[in-house]
């Protein structure tokens, strides 16, 4: 049995072997496969493909050659890896949607934006593009170093001359071991302008460079949102750039719209993007899309059409598509490249500095090469001049020599010529002895002397060499530069907020006594005449009822003030939209209320930063406070203190004011005080406040509102038993803050205590809610106007154990006058309550919730006649009461 060759077996620790082998592998991937060189922006495989094309003479003016021939030559000579990796790299360089400036001119199927693969290499053909010649220009003039190929039988370039900044022009991406690179493409004109600026000012800042280089310029065009991501990437080498499709909303007749996408983000697969949209529509995550089709063609370019339903908001759908599909995506910049053979994270300026230094080296080495060649030629011409001056002696010497070697030696010795000069004389043809040829040699020699002087001047002065680099870059810019494709949109577009995805519409937010909250479109409720039955606004739990109601836009802010003096904030759209009969969700699921905390007031505000608005607070014990609205612009999720007060007190209401109004405070025993808001000094957010009204025993504040000085507004009073009236504000004289107030209604067993005191103009509608959850909407103008001491008229006939819980005013709409028979539909629920719905309101003014109680009425004619008679008797009683008061 033969013995094993022991000398070939080396025992090693497996840990050391794994460490060293993996390190060798990692360095091989990093240096020789995955990362581009900072000088020419190419990985080895791309560099070898382009050099192979150049060696095979596949220039733009020559015919196409089979891709298989190119791949085979590159694989056999320079790249000892699979043919598929070489072909895929070449295909990518030929795709105008992958490379901003394609380096390969492909003929045949080279793939598409839909992710279709290229045809097999035996079917496609390729050659270099014109701009590729600039990467290879002067490669044979000793401008770069050549190295041995993998088997030592060929030579290949270690880097290309790269006469334009290809690293940034076409970008690069690659995954190495422990690192990755992702560099976006840029516009060639901007890049060269940036290099020129850098060459003139080496201390230029990145901000100044960005005046020339606006940002990435993707081959698929599209939009870039904002410059903050670009600036961060240029300054640090890392950053995220938001890309967005270019889409327009077009009218398609019949009041319908469609979204047309004409440009998509870089590296987005169009087919998958369309599939994603279809999936979202199928899963009902995006509503309102009726049709989706791809109309892309060579004639129209990219064109994806999304038809929108007639009643849908196309802008909101588009914003949802941006957020949930690749119509908007980000490009993660990670500018890692090989610098002196080592991977390094570089910023924009460093990339341009390294490129500029490379160009200076290329031009310097080319100049040195040209100088050597020029001097060699001048040396030969000097020998020829000597020969022409001594032609007879030269001929005689040659004729006397027995061999070429003897003739060469004789010429060198006799005429002091070098070996090269002697050889050139021996190689000279007889026709060059003519006078014309003599003149040509003399002219060429003189030109060479001038050329040599120019080359030496370039090498002697760095600024002259730099100017030559500038001139050549300018020439390339003028030949190949083009307009920017990608538009950079400025101004807060980095991220889509939730608000951008929500249609702006008028809504009603209701809050029940047991703290259930929900929102509904304001069109859910329609106007009815005074005494109407009402619309079922919610199905409440046993002993629960609507206690707060406010109208606003989905994009407005809602401030929630609690009885404990705290404030919370939500956007209108953050309150869940539920059905009209739904009870809502627990308010603690929307805002983080503390124990025993109840919402006392909801206020809708458009601009929390306003310096012209104030909030006025009133507590049950008659304390008031005025504070600037801007103090409440930053409210945390868990709320903040809005007002401080004693333990036996609580917050009753808050009102939004302009700072120049009159304050009205009403009590349950029908006292009302009116005083100027200016008498309230603005206090901080957490301040306690001052006395607003002096209360009688057993009395408490139930209402707070504001009125303009000398206004024609009226005070609306509603009692718990469903009675109400209007009284001009001017019937209530101005008094000093802290007084007891004056009488605003006569309290009887029929009326009950006051539950609502607010101001109206007579042009509003009134939303009235009962503890049974019934909501009615009526015109304020239908409510009788009476004196201060009057009891009021019946607004709603309440059932047993019913009382008014909430009253809120909303903007009157002309559509409210539409005939009910034409516009409304009604159904009767199991409990006999009529439920009606009609789209009539477009309320643009956020309303204030009013801390009060509700209303109901009859439908048949007999009940209507009874109601009229009751109103007449009410007025008679009021007149009698007024006469008694005057006496």
Curated annotation (Swiss-Prot):
It comes from the Bacteria. The gene is gyrA. This is DNA gyrase subunit A. Keywords: Antibiotic resistance, ATP-binding, Cytoplasm, DNA-binding, Isomerase, Nucleotide-binding, Topoisomerase. Heterotetramer, composed of two GyrA and two GyrB chains. In the heterotetramer, GyrA contains the active site tyrosine that forms a transient covalent intermediate with DNA, while GyrB binds cofactors and catalyzes ATP hydrolysis. It is found in: Cytoplasm. SUPFAM superfamilies: GyrA/ParC C-terminal domain-like, Type II DNA topoisomerase. Residues 813-823 have a biased composition (Acidic residues). One of its GO terms (cellular component) is DNA topoisomerase type II (double strand cut, ATP-hydrolyzing) complex. Coiled coil: none annotated. It is an enzyme of class 5 (isomerase). A type II topoisomerase that negatively supercoils closed circular double-stranded (ds) DNA in an ATP-dependent manner to modulate DNA topology and maintain chromosomes in an underwound state. Negative supercoiling favors strand separation, and DNA replication, transcription, recombination and repair, all of which involve strand separation. Also able to catalyze the interconversion of other topological isomers of dsDNA rings, including catenanes and knotted rings. Type II topoisomerases break and join 2 DNA strands simultaneously in an ATP-dependent manner. Belongs to the type II topoisomerase GyrA/ParC subunit family. The active site is at 123 (o-(5'-phospho-dna)-tyrosine intermediate). GO terms for biological process: DNA topological change; DNA-templated DNA replication; response to antibiotic. It catalyses: ATP-dependent breakage, passage and rejoining of double-stranded DNA. Residues 35-501 form the Topo IIA-type catalytic domain. Its EC number is 5.6.2.2. Few gyrases are as efficient as E.coli at forming negative supercoils. Not all organisms have 2 type II topoisomerases; in organisms with a single type II topoisomerase this enzyme also has to decatenate newly replicated chromosomes. Its main location: cytoplasm. The keyword DNA-binding applies. A motif (GyrA-box) lies at residues 528-534. Residues 811-864 are annotated as: Disordered. GO terms for molecular function: ATP binding; DNA binding; DNA negative supercoiling activity.
């Amino acid at each position: 049995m033969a013995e094993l060759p022991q000398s070939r077996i080396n025992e090693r620790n497996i840990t050391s072997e794994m460490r060293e082998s993996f390190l060798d592998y990692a360095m091989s991937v990093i240096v020789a496969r995955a990362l581009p060189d900072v000088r020419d922006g190419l990985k080895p495989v791309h560099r070898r493909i382009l050099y192979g094309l150049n060696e095979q003479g596949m220039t733009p003016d020559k015919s196409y050659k089979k891709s298989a021939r190119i791949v085979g030559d590159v694989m056999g000579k320079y790249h000892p890896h699979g043919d598929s990796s070489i072909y895929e790299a070449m295909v990518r360089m030929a795709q105008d949607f992958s490379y901003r400036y394609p380096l390969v001119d492909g003929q045949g199927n080279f793939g598409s934006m839909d992710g279709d693969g290229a045809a097999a290499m035996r079917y496609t053909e390729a050659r270099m593009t014109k701009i590729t010649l600039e990467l290879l220009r002067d490669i044979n003039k000793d401008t770069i170093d050549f190295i041995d190929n993998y088997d030592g039988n060929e030579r290949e370039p270690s880097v290309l001359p790269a006469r334009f900044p290809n690293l940034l022009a076409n970008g690069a991406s690659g995954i190495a071991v422990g690192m990755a690179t992702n560099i976006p493409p840029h516009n060639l004109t901007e890049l060269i302008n940036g290099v020129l600026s850098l060459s003139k000012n080496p201390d230029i800042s990145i901000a100044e460079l960005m005046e020339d280089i606006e940002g990435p310029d993707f081959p698929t065009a599209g939009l870039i949102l904002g410059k903050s991501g670009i600036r961060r990437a240029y300054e640090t080498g890392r950053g995220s750039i938001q890309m967005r499709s270019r889409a327009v909303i077009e009218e398609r007749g019949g009041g319908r719209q469609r979204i047309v996408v004409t440009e998509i983000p870089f590296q987005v697969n169009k087919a998958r993007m369309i599939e994603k949209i279809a999936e979202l529509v199928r899963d009902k995550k995006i509503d309102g899309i009726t049709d989706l089709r791809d109309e892309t063609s060579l004639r129209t370019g990219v064109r994806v059409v999304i038809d929108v339903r007639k009643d849908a908001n196309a802008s909101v759908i588009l914003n949802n598509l941006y957020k949930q599909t690749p119509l908007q995506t980000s490009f993660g910049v990670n500018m890692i490249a090989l610098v002196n053979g080592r991977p390094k994270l570089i910023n924009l300026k460093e990339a341009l500095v390294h490129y500029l230094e490379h160009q200076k080296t290329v031009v310097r080495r080319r100049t040195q090469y040209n100088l050597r060649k020029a001097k060699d030629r001048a040396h030969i011409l000097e020998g020829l001049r000597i020969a022409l001056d001594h032609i007879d002696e030269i001929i005689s010497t040659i004729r006397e020599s027995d061999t070429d070697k003897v003739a060469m030696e004789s010429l060198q010795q006799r005429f002091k010529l070098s070996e090269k000069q002697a050889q050139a004389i021996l190689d000279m043809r007889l026709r060059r002895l003519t006078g014309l040829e003599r003149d040509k040699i003399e002219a060429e020699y003189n030109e060479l002397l001038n050329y040599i002087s120019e080359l030496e001047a370039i090498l002697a002065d760095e600024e002259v060499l730099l100017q030559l680099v500038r001139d050549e870059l300018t020439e390339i810019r003028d030949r190949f530069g083009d307009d920017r494709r990608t538009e950079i949109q400025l101004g807060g577009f980095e991220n889509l907020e939730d608000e951008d995805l929500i249609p702006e519409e008028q809504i009603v937010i209701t809050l029940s006594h047991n703290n259930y909250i929900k929102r509904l479109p304001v069109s859910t409720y329609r106007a009815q005449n005074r005494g109407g039955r009402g619309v079922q606004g919610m199905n409440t739990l046993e002993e629960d009822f609507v206690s707060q109601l406010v109208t606003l836009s989905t994009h407005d802010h809602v401030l929630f003030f609690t009885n404990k003096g705290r404030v919370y904030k939500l956007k209108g759209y953050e309150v869940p939209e539920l059905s009209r009969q739904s009870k809502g969700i627990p308010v603690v699921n929307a805002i983080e209320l503390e124990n025993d905390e109840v919402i006392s007031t909801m206020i809708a505000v458009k601009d929390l930063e306003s310096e012209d608005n104030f909030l006025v607070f009133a507590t049950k014990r008659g304390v008031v406070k005025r504070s600037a609205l801007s103090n409440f612009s930053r409210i945390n999720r868990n709320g903040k203190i809005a007002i401080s007060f004693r333990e036996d007190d609580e917050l009753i209401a808050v009102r939004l004011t302009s700072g120049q109004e009159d304050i009205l405070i009403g009590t349950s025993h029908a006292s009302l005080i009116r005083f100027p808001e200016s008498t309230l000094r603005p206090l901080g957010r957490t301040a306690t406040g001052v006395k607003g009204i002096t209360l009688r025993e057993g009395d408490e504040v139930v209402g707070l509102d504001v009125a303009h000085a000398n206004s024609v507004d009226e005070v609306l009073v509603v009692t718990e038993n469903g009675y109400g009236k209007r009284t001009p504000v001017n019937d209530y004289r101005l008094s000093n803050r802290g007084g007891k107030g004056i009488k605003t209604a006569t309290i009887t067993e029929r009326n009950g205590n006051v539950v609502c005191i607010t101001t109206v103009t007579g042009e509003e509608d009134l939303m009235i809610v009962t503890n049974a959850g019934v909501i009615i909407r009526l015109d304020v103008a239908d409510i009788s106007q009476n004196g201060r001491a009057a009891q009021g008229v019946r607004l709603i006939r309440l059932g047993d154990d019913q009382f008014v819980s909430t009253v809120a005013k909303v903007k009157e709409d002309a559509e409210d006058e539409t005939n009910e028979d034409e516009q409304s539909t009604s159904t009767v629920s199991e409990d006999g309550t009529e439920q009606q719905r009609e789209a009539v309101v477009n309320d643009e003014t956020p309303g204030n919730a009013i801390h009060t109680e509700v209303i109901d009425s009859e439908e048949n004619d007999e009940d209507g006649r009874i109601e009229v008679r009751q109103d007449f008797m009410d007025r008679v009683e009021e007149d009698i009461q007024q006469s008694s008061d005057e006496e």
